[in-house]
Every structure is written in C-alpha cells, then in structure tokens.
Amino acid sequence: MPTFSQLVRKGRTAPRYKTASPALQGSPQRRGVCTRVYTQTPKKPNSALRKVARVRLTNGIEVTTYIPGIGHNLQEHSIVLIRGGRVKDLPGVRYHVVRGTLDSVGVANRKQGRSKYGAKRAKGGAAAGKK
C-alpha cells in the first residue's frame, strides 16, 4: 500500500482498457479487400459451415471476418466494410462484414431485422404495411 506522499508524487494509475477489436484502431468501421472467402466449422457443441472471409484492411492489418445472413456474393478481391463484433463459436473471428455496403449485397427475401442485413423493404401490397 503506498504512503500518502507517494500518492501525491505519482498518483494512482487507472487500469488500461483493452479493446475487443484492435484492428479497427478506434474507428467504428473500416474498409478492406477480401483475400480469401471460405467456410469454417464452429466450436464443440455446435455444428455448421460458417461463412468467413480473410480481409486486408486499409491500415494493412489482415483479419478474419464473419459474413452474416443466408447467402452472399463475396469472392476474392471484393471490397467490404467491416465492423467489430465477435462470433462466439468461431475462435479468432472478431469482426463482421457490413451487408448492403460496397461490394456486399444485402440478404435476399429478408422481412424482419432488415437493417442488420442490408435488406431493402419489400414492395408488397396491403400486407407489407400492416402487421
């Protein structure tokens, strides 16, 4: 325990905050180019083929990003926008692709939660406006 005079001289150091998405370097999103698009299997209790992409960002860092939603059009050299947010059952995947921006199209036939997947509003008749 420090003495009072030691605290006057140096003060207490505040604990350093460790960011969950260091490659963004404080930005909300960042642009990058897909270097590889592939599928990955999740951790133990789950079973699937999750769609992921290796992306080289504009700051030179290369990260693994998750492609959310059903179906995508991404391939090598596609330009994507990424945001933070990890995927719990994919180790090392700490970023998400933002759907509906740059080369990534929105999810087709999406009715609910459309803003998360870059889907436009359906042009249906009376049923589209009412619940």
Curated annotation (Swiss-Prot):
GO cellular component terms, A-Z: small ribosomal subunit
SUPFAM superfamilies linked to this entry: Nucleic acid-binding proteins
Pfam hit, one: Ribosom_S12_S23
Composition-biased stretches (Basic residues): 111-131
UniProtKB keywords: Methylation, Ribonucleoprotein, Ribosomal protein, RNA-binding, rRNA-binding, tRNA-binding
InterPro entries: NA-bd_OB-fold, Ribosomal_uS12, Ribosomal_uS12_bac
Residue numbers bearing the 3-methylthioaspartic acid modification: 89
GO biological process, one term: translation
GO molecular function, one term: structural constituent of ribosome
UniProt xrefs under PROSITE patterns: RIBOSOMAL_S12
Disulfide bonds, paired cysteine numbers: none
Chain segments carrying region Disordered: 1-32, 110-131
NCBIfam families: rpsL_bact (TIGR00981)
Quaternary structure, from the entry: Part of the 30S ribosomal subunit. Contacts proteins S8 and S17. May interact with IF1 in the 30S initiation complex.
Protein function: With S4 and S5 plays an important role in translational accuracy. Interacts with and stabilizes bases of the 16S rRNA that are involved in tRNA selection in the A site and with the mRNA backbone. Located at the interface of the 30S and 50S subunits, it traverses the body of the 30S subunit contacting proteins on the other side and probably holding the rRNA structure together. The combined cluster of proteins S8, S12 and S17 appears to hold together the shoulder and platform of the 30S subunit.
Family assignment from sequence similarity: Belongs to the universal ribosomal protein uS12 family.
PANTHER family noted in UniProt: 30S RIBOSOMAL PROTEIN S12 FAMILY MEMBER
Name the record gives this protein: Small ribosomal subunit protein uS12
